[in-house]
Swiss-Prot record:
Name by which UniProt lists this protein: Nucleolar protein 3
Gene name of this polypeptide: NOL3
Domain of life of the organism encoding this protein: Eukaryota
CDD domains: CARD
Effect of K163R: Abolished ubiquitination in response to an apoptotic stimulus
Amino acid sequence: MGNAQERPSETIDRERKRLVETLQADSGLLLDALLARGVLTGPEYEALDALPDAERRVRRLLLLVQGKGEAACQELLRCAQRTAGAPDPAWDWQHVGPGYRDRSYDPPCPGHWTPEAPGSGTTCPGLPRASDPDEAGGPEGSEAVQSGTPEEPEPELEAEASKEAEPEPEPEPELEPEAEAEPEPELEPEPDPEPEPDFEERDESEDS
């Protein structure tokens, strides 16, 4: 297996003979893959594809790619494994990035994104996080939560809730007592009738 400290260009130097022997049969497909991934330009692709000898084509391809730098060498090793149809441990460079244009293996510049360490705590996109009970628990956890909640509330609780919800009626203002009827004025007693003068005259006559 490729050494983690080994550069892609060093891997090509070490495995050059086996690469040339293995890639001769599918050199055209290898050229197509390198052109699609941006390693080769159009004129370079046309020049290599025009060579009639497959061995010479692969040898010139390896030299051309090594002259483009480590990013191109890295991409060549990836395309070589795919073109060969089976991964070869000798070509398995461990730090193969997602693409030639990304150049993720180069030393990062200050302020640029760097790959997260395995123990940094970041989760892969699409995987449920342990802190998410809905995703981590699955359907069983959701069923357990649903089974723990009562389906219908008790009637007593409903009655209490309805009482609390209804606003208390406001007390009616007390009516002021009607003013007491004024007492009717008392009638003055009629004076006694004066005695008739006949009796007085009789008394005077008796005295005389």
